[in-house]
Amino acid sequence: MTKSELIERLAGQQSHIPAKVVEDAVKEMLEQMASTLAEGDRIEIRGFGSFSLHYRAPRVGRNPKTGDKVELEGKYVPHFKPGKELRDRANIYG
């Protein structure tokens, strides 16, 4: 599901709220989540999961076109850990 599909679905379920308001709310929520992670804080949504930053150590990679070795710096990357409720709901396909 893309962001625009999410907005469409929410707007369809909440017909009393204009689609533009739904779009602005979704965009603001995602912006707040990104800002929180950028500040190094963790986000926890009970029953859904948690977002945090994980450190990736420096390593030697390869340029896929040339095959040359490239030094990659360490960096923090976003990480999502699903909550038990979400894992259980998703497990119907497993």
Curated annotation (Swiss-Prot):
Identify the keywords attached in UniProt to this record, alphabetized.
Answer: DNA recombination, DNA-binding, Transcription, Transcription regulation, Translation regulation
Q: Does the keyword Iron apply?
A: no
Entry's InterPro entries? Hist_DNA-bd, Histone-like_DNA-bd_CS, IHF-like_DNA-bd_dom_sf, IHF_beta
Q: Which PROSITE patterns match?
A: HISTONE_LIKE (PS00045)
Q: Which GO terms describe its molecular function?
A: DNA binding; structural constituent of chromatin
UniProt cross-references to CDD domains, sorted A to Z? IHF_B
Q: Which GO terms describe its cellular component?
A: chromosome; cytosol
- State the coiled-coil residue ranges: none
Q: Name one GO biological process term.
A: DNA recombination
Q: Which Gene3D superfamilies match?
A: IHF-like DNA-binding proteins (4.10.520.10)
What does it do?
Answer: This protein is one of the two subunits of integration host factor, a specific DNA-binding protein that functions in genetic recombination as well as in transcriptional and translational control.
User: Which NCBIfam families has this protein been placed in?
Assistant: hip, PRK00199.1
Q: Which family does it belong to?
A: Belongs to the bacterial histone-like protein family.
Q: How does it assemble?
A: Heterodimer of an alpha and a beta chain.
Q: What is this protein called?
A: Integration host factor subunit beta
**To which species is this protein native?**
Pectobacterium atrosepticum (strain SCRI 1043 / ATCC BAA-672)
Which gene specifies this protein's sequence?
ihfB
